[in-house]
Amino acid sequence: GLDDAILIKDNHVAVCGGVDAAVRRARAMAGHLMKVELEVDGLDQLDDALALIGEGLAPDVIMLDNFSLDDLREGVRRTAGRITLEASGGVDLTTVRAIAETGVNVISVGALTHSAPVLDIGLDAV
């Protein structure tokens, strides 16, 4: 369901005043069993999230949104397996292998929902 985790998006980060404040707020609201995922759009935000590891407040998953392949590799290097990394944005059949080879743990494919072909179904009541 949509109630078993917290996803911190870019607008949440902006409203809270930055990654640190947004993650701290989410952690304060989340129970110890609730996962927290953070979307970041640059290596600077990734570094802000990684800085919370020492306090035990870092997100469980960090979504690297629309990162280049080089930045994905660098994110994997900086994270060094301490947090699950998800790649998102620009994923399709032509890019998925190269994205997987960067070393991220998870790849999300938005095209499965926003670009899926429409099936025309009709129903006749009898």
Show where each model-derived region lies.
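Catalytic cores of alpha/beta
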Residues: G42-L57, F67-A80, L85-A87, V91-V109
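Flexible C-terminal active-site loop/helix
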Residues: A98-V126
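Gly/Ser/Thr-rich beta-alpha loop segments that engage phosphate groups in nucleotides
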Residues: D3, V13, V91-D92, L112, ...
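Flexible, active-site-adjacent loop/turn segments at secondary-structure boundaries
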Residues: D4-I6, D65, G89, G110, ...
